[in-house]
């Protein structure tokens, strides 16, 4: 388990997902360290998928978005992760921020937008 004032990262064994819960906006190491921890979880749990709850605290910061493409994405590809889930709010307030990430991520992963873990569970059960 990883915990900070910005983000909590945990492993959900039932769903076999690493769950990244953003609490408030952050950047640089405060943004990157939780994602590096998530990569380690995915490496250690075969078939583990990635799920980010973006309803609180997620914003697009150009340097961190580039870091996702340059560092997170290549490292995630070294794991057995096949699906990436973004939990969004009903009005999808972060649509623009997430579209940039999703366009690149969806080239290599199955990307889903969900309204909660129940939706994630349904997709994984298909």
Predicted regions, residues:
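Amphipathic, Lys/Arg-enriched alpha-helical "gate/interface" segment within cytosolic domains
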Residues: 1-126
């Amino acid at each position: 388990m990883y915990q900070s004032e910005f983000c909590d990262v945990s492993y959900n064994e039932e769903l076999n997902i690493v769950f990244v819960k953003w609490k408030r906006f952050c950047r640089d190491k405060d943004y990157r360290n939780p994602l590096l921890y998530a990569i380690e979880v995915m490496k250690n749990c075969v078939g583990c998928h990635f799920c980010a709850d973006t309803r609180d605290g997620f914003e697009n910061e150009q340097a961190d978005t580039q870091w996702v493409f340059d560092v997170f994405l290549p490292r995630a590809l070294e794991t057995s992760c096949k699906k990436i889930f973004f939990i969004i709010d009903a009005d999808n307030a972060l649509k623009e921020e997430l579209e940039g990430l999703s366009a690149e991520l969806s080239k290599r992963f199955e990307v889903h937008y969900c309204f909660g873990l129940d939706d994630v569970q349904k997709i994984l059960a298909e």
